[in-house]
């Protein structure tokens, strides 16, 4: 008797599954049987392959380089002293325009302002095509050297403000970014002697406080002017001043002299000071000679102008009466017929007096002269009258004095 199921035999099911890895269809049998794995599991396994470690390292280095470049663009110290100054370690294997470092043969290369003495002024020869002095030139070569110089970088506001989208901007976008230079660095900003050393601390120039208009020079000049005004009192204006200014007198450049003539400083330029300055320029050869108009006028002053307040004061000074240089003999005849001849008065005593008294008050001088004449005439006539027994007539002397 035949058992159920023994006579029928079903063939095995042939699985034709395409391998997701090789893409080749497998045949029958156990070797051809491949279990289909999900694709997300294969993607997860790929991260552990040895070939992916080098790529990951390159990605990390590139990201770090980009982050460093971004930080470098935002730092003022880096831009002034390192941007296009430090040589790049990667060489030519990347885009130079995206790199903040210097490369061989790059036109944007800068000289280190801490090593080379050059100002922030553009070199005219470099603009024309080339400078023969090279790195020894005292002026800036190129836009980066000019505007990234420590004396010029972010010393002016940007016209676009916070809306500026430049990768490297030379100007300040906010008041906090605006750099204020010390006076010593401001003095040397446009001069080749003003070497940029803001990061390391530039030494102050010994001439920083001696330029025209500095507080020290102005104070010295005001002190000198005050002393000159005090010495220009009415009792000493005709005393001949020294040929050269005193030692405390500060030297003045043409610009400072022009500022003095324009009255740029406080207390200078007023009519009174103009008169004092003109009086300080007096050059009188002899106290007996009348003052000359040319000797009163210093260089650069135009007293001929009718609008000048000092012209009127100078004209009034020139119009004062002058002292006669020689006196003729005086003959006096009394009522009794006696004749008395008086010799010219010795002017040696008058020269010892203050010269300003002779110029300032001619009437007082005449009174003194006639007073002495009257005394001498009185002595002579008294002797003659005593001999003749007649009283002298001195009424004419009183008329002259009055």
From Swiss-Prot:
Residues 242-253 have a biased composition (Pro residues). Residues 180-211, 232-258 are annotated as: Disordered. It comes from the Eukaryota. Pfam families: zf-CCCH (PF00642), zf-CCCH_AtC3H23 (PF25512). Residues 183-192 have a biased composition (Polar residues). Residues 232-241 have a biased composition (Low complexity). Keywords: DNA-binding, Metal-binding, Repeat, Zinc, Zinc-finger. This is Zinc finger CCCH domain-containing protein 35.
């Amino acid at each position: 008797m035949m058992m159920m199921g023994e006579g029928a035999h079903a063939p095995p099911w042939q699985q034709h599954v395409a391998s997701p890895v090789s893409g080749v269809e497998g045949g029958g049998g156990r070797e051809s049987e491949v279990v289909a794995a999900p694709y997300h599991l294969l993607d997860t396994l790929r991260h552990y392959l040895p070939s992916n470690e080098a790529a990951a390292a390159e990605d990390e280095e590139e990201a770090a380089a980009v982050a460093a470049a971004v930080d470098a663009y935002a730092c003022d110290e880096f831009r002034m002293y390192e941007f296009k100054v430090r040589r790049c370690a990667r060489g030519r294997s990347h885009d130079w325009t995206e790199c903040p470092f210097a490369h061989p043969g790059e036109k944007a290369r800068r000289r280190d302002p801490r090593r080379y003495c050059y100002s922030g002024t553009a070199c005219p020869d470099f603009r024309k095509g080339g400078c023969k002095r090279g790195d020894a030139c005292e002026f800036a070569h190129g836009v980066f050297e000019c505007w990234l110089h420590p004396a010029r970088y972010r010393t002016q506001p940007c016209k676009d403000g916070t809306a500026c989208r430049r990768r490297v901007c030379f100007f300040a976008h906010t008041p906090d970014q605006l750099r204020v230079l010390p006076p010593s660095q401001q003095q040397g900003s446009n001069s080749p002697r003003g070497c940029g050393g803001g990061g390391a601390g530039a030494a102050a120039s010994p001439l920083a406080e001696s330029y025209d208009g500095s507080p020290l020079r102005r104070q010295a000049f005001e002190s000198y002017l005050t002393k000159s005004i005090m010495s220009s009192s009415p009792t000493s204006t005709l005393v001949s001043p020294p040929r050269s200014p005193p030692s405390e007198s500060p030297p003045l450049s043409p610009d400072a002299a022009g500022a003095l003539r324009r009255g740029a400083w406080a207390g200078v330029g007023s009519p009174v000071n103009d008169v004092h300055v003109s009086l300080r320029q007096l050059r009188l050869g002899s106290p007996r000679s009348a003052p000359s108009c040319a000797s009163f006028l210093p260089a650069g002053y135009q007293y001929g102008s009718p609008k000048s307040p000092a012209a009127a004061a100078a004209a009034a000074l020139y119009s004062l009466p002058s002292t006669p240089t020689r006196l003729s003999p005086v003959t006096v005849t009394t009522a009794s017929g006696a004749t008395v001849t008086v010799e010219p008065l010795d002017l040696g005593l008058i020269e010892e007096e203050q010269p300003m008294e002779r110029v300032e008050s001619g009437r007082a001088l005449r009174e003194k002269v006639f007073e002495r004449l009257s005394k001498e005439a009185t002595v002579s006539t008294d002797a003659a009258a005593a001999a003749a027994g007649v009283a002298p007539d001195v009424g004419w002397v009183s008329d002259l004095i009055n």
